[in-house]
A protein has these predicted regions:
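Phosphate-bearing ligand-interacting subdomains
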Residues: 42-131, 135-137, 156
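Cytosolic Rossmann-like ligand/nucleotide-binding regulatory domains
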Residues: 3, 7, 11, 34, ...
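Short beta-strand element of Class I
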Residues: 30-32, 99
Length: 181
């Protein structure tokens, strides 16, 4: 059964926003990208369902652009904290079902959370933690934090364990470790 696609509005087409928008579109989702910068919008036109010049601080302009008809919105406005806050507030007022917002620091994070963002992202801190985990342990190829202290980790199996039966490894006997295959 094919995966159901959703529609996404990405407000702010800088490095972070444009990367998210392009990936969502690559997955087959309907994506509108919006930014005040005409050059950023122009670069996205060939790749997205729609790309528009839009002031996300203007609730009426967002409604006119049909942002309220999208399932999920991402506020990826980076440098202008006031614009980020107003865009998040406008999305909530428009009734967008799910709102993710990018924050620049902890205070910004708290404000966006209080405004009703469903998830607030601190990309530099999150990527910094991710990089530190992988640098700390060279056997870790990649990992995903699941929250509450749980992670899925992709590790390089040492040569000495090559060919060993999984049952002989005593995985989980001392730690709460589970093998996924």
């Amino acid at each position: 059964m094919p995966k159901e696609t959703r529609s996404f509005a990405v407000l702010g087409l800088g490095g972070f926003g444009s990367t998210v928008a392009l990936e969502l579109a690559r997955f087959g989702n309907r994506v509108i990208g919006a930014d005040l910068d005409e050059r950023k919008v122009s670069r996205m036109v060939p790749h997205l369902h729609s790309a528009i010049i839009l002031d996300a601080t203007d609730e009426a302009a967002m409604r006119e652009a049909g942002i309220d008809r999208y399932d999920v919105a991402l506020v990826a406005i980076g440098r202008d904290i006031k614009a980020s806050i107003l865009a998040t507030m406008n999305l909530r007022l428009l009734g967008v079902g799910t709102i993710w917002s990018k924050a620049s620091d902890r205070t910004h994070h708290r404000i966006l959370s209080k405004l009703g963002a469903d998830r607030v992202i601190l990309p530099e801190q999150e990527m910094g933690r991710h990089s530190a985990q992988m640098l700390h342990n060279p056997a870790v190829q990649d990992y995903v934090s699941l929250g509450n202290g749980f992670s899925v980790v992709n590790i390089i199996v040492p040569e000495k364990l090559d060919g060993e039966a999984v049952s002989a490894l005593a995985i989980g006997s001392e730690n709460d470790i589970r093998l996924l295959g």
